[in-house]
Amino acid sequence: MADTWVRMAGFYATGNAGSFFLPEIGDEVVVGFFDNDPRFPVILGSLYNGKNASPYTADAKNSIKAIVTKSLMKLEFNDEKKIITLVTPGNNTIIISDDAKSIEITDQNNNSIKLESGGITMNSPKDINIKATGNINMNATGKINVSATQDLALTGLNVAATAQVGFTGKGNATAEVSASGQTAIKGAMVMIN
């Protein structure tokens, strides 16, 4: 029998859009024929069998749906807990969970960003770098706390620190205010001890 081109049915197909899932070589497929004519076959779907088993085991709840590629990239839907999970073979993961009321992004290097009711948390075993070609603005209706177990450095063309009520600069060991030009200390009353 001569080779025949076979069309593939998809669950959605339209101009330059739709689903794109082709069976692998050697997969078991279900074939139909347009107008019952064997010259015009169409693949209707794929089947699991003893050689190609399902990546999941069915249960009575039937709450898990998934798309798993041959390289084990996975998109999983959990209808019971309302969770969507996207994961790569290297364990880069996105979890969107109504059950935990959170969104979490984790990579294979243990960097993570978590959005939940208590706020947003970023974690990294190494550095976190934030860059912008424009401005970076941070605003909080409460406090902003910046702390480091080692040095804390602020560098800019000009550095301005303004307090609406009080301003304290303190060094437990030493403190220095210096300039290569003029240095001015002003106040209604200046006390130097």
State where each predicted segment sits:
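Short, structured beta-strand/loop micro-motifs enriched in basic residues and often containing a Trp
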Residues: 4-15
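Right-handed beta-helix
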Residues: 14-193
